[in-house]
């Protein structure tokens, strides 16, 4: 073997060794995660088995309190009623009343015909002649004489 080939082979072996080490590290990591998940599942099962409905009232209350997650208030999800001031309520009512009057005025303008658009803009002249379209009865080979042109 030449020196270059030997060096290349040694490099390839080193790369393969690093890759094998990485694979074994990943496998070990997956095994550790699986073991941790198994322990968590076993702890959950033990907690469920501890209180299978046979405990007396008040017994294992500490265990139940520890197992139940604490309720935390989430800010911004609900607005307390005290936060709304009387002035804001009055302002909303006044705005709603003003909005109704604007809508009524718009409806009156439509009904009365007050429009900013001139009617001449929609007059389209027709330069062609109107042709009367007549149906030819020549192709009524299947006419049974009943007067109905429905196809059967």
UniProtKB/Swiss-Prot annotation:
Domain of life, source organism: Eukaryota
Keyword Nucleus: yes
Acidic residues compositional bias, start-end: 99-152
Disordered: region residues: 29-152
Expression across tissues: Expressed in the brain.
Protein name: Bacchus
Protein function: Negatively regulates tyramine beta-hydroxylase tbh and thus the conversion of tyramine (TA) to octopamine (OA). In tyrosine decarboxylase 2 (Tdc2) neurons, acts in an amine-mediated signaling pathway to negatively regulate acute ethanol sensitivity probably via tbh-mediated depletion of TA.
Localization (cell): Nucleus
Biased composition (Basic and acidic residues): 29-41, 72-89
Gene Ontology cellular-component terms listed: nucleoplasm; nucleus
UniProtKB keywords: Nucleus
Biological process according to GO: behavioral response to ethanol
Skewed-composition ranges (Low complexity): 42-51
Organism expressing this protein natively: Drosophila melanogaster (Fruit fly)
Knockout-associated phenotype: RNAi-mediated knockdown in neurons causes a reduction in sensitivity to ethanol intoxication.
The keyword Nucleus appears for this protein: yes
């Amino acid at each position: 073997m030449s020196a270059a080939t030997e060096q290349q082979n040694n490099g390839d072996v080193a790369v393969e060794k690093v890759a094998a080490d990485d694979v074994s590290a990943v496998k070990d990591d997956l095994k550790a995660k699986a073991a941790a998940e198994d322990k968590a599942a076993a702890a959950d099962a033990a907690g469920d088995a501890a209180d299978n409905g046979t405990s007396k009232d008040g017994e294992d209350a500490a265990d139940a309190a520890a197992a139940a997650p604490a309720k935390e208030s989430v800010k911004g999800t609900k607005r307390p009623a005290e936060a709304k001031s009387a002035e804001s309520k009055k302002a909303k009512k006044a705005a709603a009343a003003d909005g109704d009057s604007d809508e009524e005025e718009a409806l009156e303008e439509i009904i009365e015909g007050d429009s900013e658009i001139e009617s001449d803009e929609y007059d389209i002249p027709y330069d062609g002649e109107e042709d009367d379209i007549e149906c030819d009865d020549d192709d009524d080979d299947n006419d049974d004489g009943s007067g109905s042109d429905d196809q059967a």
